[in-house]
């Protein structure tokens, strides 16, 4: 069965109830929340989904410079913790998967001083750590290929697929 949903981030700071009401009126059956475990209230999300007969099948991960899965340092650790916290949020709202962009959205040039191999290895290790936690909770992680105007890293389906194969994880 197919589900028709909309990702919430495209409406910006619109009130959740306004978005949910519009989705129901337009015949949608789902909503994709931004993976914002620190800003969204899971209980409010549940109430709105129930009120407007919606389901949440996925969360859209938000990855910036401070959440960089290609980083071996603090930004990489922060990204892993963010994904773990997002997994907990996904469980609360009934989402089955989280969309993951391995590098910061908006960084279109590879960081100086690192090879693509080093950055890829960092991403693989960080995503595996988050995937271990996701698997325990029954949540899948999905690598999203975004275009070259938004990232230097996994910016084609071929590159994203190669990363998935290298991660080699059930989650």
Regions found by a protein language model. Give the residues of each.
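N-terminal pre-domain/capping segments
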Residues: 1-95, 117, 128, 169
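Active-site acidic/histidine proton-transfer and metal-coordination neighborhood
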Residues: 74-171
